[in-house]
């Protein structure tokens, strides 16, 4: 097995396959492992949404949040003076379902890398127009997840 393992490691290097690491385990015991890249922080992109939703669930279980909590009520300091009435209808449940009503994939891709909305994403998002009734339509949105996560932070 050891020879096959190291032959595979060599093949990964030779073919530049982009593998970060490999391990062979038996139950909980790691028998062999090899790391092709140094230990460093990685951007895990949308995996973060799973952790955020788990944190929301824990906060709900602890009584710190409710699915019916309203976004604008959590961040009154970020609500613009001329806010649309629909902004006050966005609830935590809408953020988790990516149906906030902003109806744009804000804070994704090139915009996020360029720092659009930074450093205050909450204030930035609460100044965006609500284009459809909250809860009515799904649009994949990093912004909705960021806002839900900020509600957890503040709870």
What kind of region is each of these model predictions?
Residues 45-51, 87-90, 139-146:
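Aromatic- and histidine-enriched alpha-helix N-cap/loop-to-helix transition segments
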Residues 15-16, 86-89, 116, 131:
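Extracellular/periplasmic catalytic domains that process cell-envelope and extracellular macromolecules
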Residues 4-38, 67:
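A short, well-structured edge-of-sheet supersecondary motif
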Residues 28, 43-68, 95, 148-153:
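Active-site SXXK
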Residues 35, 40, 70-79, 109-111:
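Short linear capping/connector segments at secondary-structure termini
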Residues 62-102, 127, 155:
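Active-site helix/loop module of the DD-peptidase/beta-lactamase fold
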Residues 40-44, 83-86, 133-140:
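Solvent-exposed loop and edge beta-strand segments that line ligand/cofactor-binding
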Residues 108-155:
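Catalytic-site signature segments of enzymes, centered on catalytic residues
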């Amino acid at each position: 097995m050891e020879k096959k393992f190291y032959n595979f490691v060599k093949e990964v290097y030779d073919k530049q396959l982009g593998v970060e690491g490999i391990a062979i385990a038996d139950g909980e015991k790691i028998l062999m492992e090899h790391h092709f890249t140094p230990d460093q922080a990685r951007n895990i992109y949308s995996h973060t949404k799973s952790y955020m939703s788990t944190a929301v669930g824990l906060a709900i279980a602890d009584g710190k949040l409710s699915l019916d909590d309203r976004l604008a009520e959590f961040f009154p300091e970020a609500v613009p003076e001329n806010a649309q009435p629909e902004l006050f209808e966005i609830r935590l449940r809408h953020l988790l379902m990516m149906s906030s009503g902003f109806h744009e994939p804000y804070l994704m891709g090139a915009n996020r890398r360029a720092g659009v909305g930074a450093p205050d994403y909450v204030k930035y998002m609460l100044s965006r127009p609500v284009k459809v009734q909250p809860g009515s339509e799904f649009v994949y949105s990093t912004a909705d997840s960021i806002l839900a996560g900020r509600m957890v932070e503040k709870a």
